[in-house]
Amino acid sequence: EVGIRKPSIYAHFQGKEDLFLQVARYAFQEQNLRIFQYFTERKEQSLEHTLHDFLFWMEQEYESNNSAKFMLRFSFFPPVSLYNEVLNIVNPFLDKMERKLTRRLRNARDREPFAHMEPADMALAYMTLVDGIIVELLYSGSTNYHRRLNAAWPIFWRGITLISSHEGSSGLNCKNIVN
């Protein structure tokens, strides 16, 4: 309850689109703070547990926090008429999260058994994992979310922590494929 009658709400905003974008910005600011708080509270915890538990935390946020639910839904399903404006909110948020995670991975290198990978690549791989699992939450709910999480997490973690003489032995470098 904000105390604004429906006919007068547009006196505070230029229109429905402006109202939507203001709420979207607010939701992203709130979630940015909550995510920062999540990682700050766990800075002494192992990175494996922090990253793994974040996936469960995101599910809990989606189920219990209206800003998180709104943010995730409109990130994946933006209104067609506001597509570019929504991307101008979503992409900087994701870039910021990627930079923070890269920094966290770089700082954890001395304490964690990482493969010889760039922290930026590991951060991007993790964010891709999060995206894929969240899509399942949005489309299918918690049961399929957990099914995907349980299948993908061990493969991801082994991939970034595997240190062996076979590392890179396939000769396949995906960066070269794109170029």
For each feature predicted by the language model, list its residue ranges.
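Hydrophobic alpha-helical connector segments
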Residues: Q22, F36-N66, M122-Y126, S165
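Amphipathic alpha-helical packing segments from all-alpha helical-bundle domains
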Residues: Q29-F36, L82-D110, A120-L124
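Secondary-structure edge/capping motif, primarily at the C-terminal ends of alpha-helices
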Residues: R42, L72-P79, L137-S140
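Residue-level recognition of alpha-helical structural elements
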Residues: K43, L47, V86, A115-P119, ...
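Amphipathic alpha-helical segments used for helix-helix packing
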Residues: Y62-E85
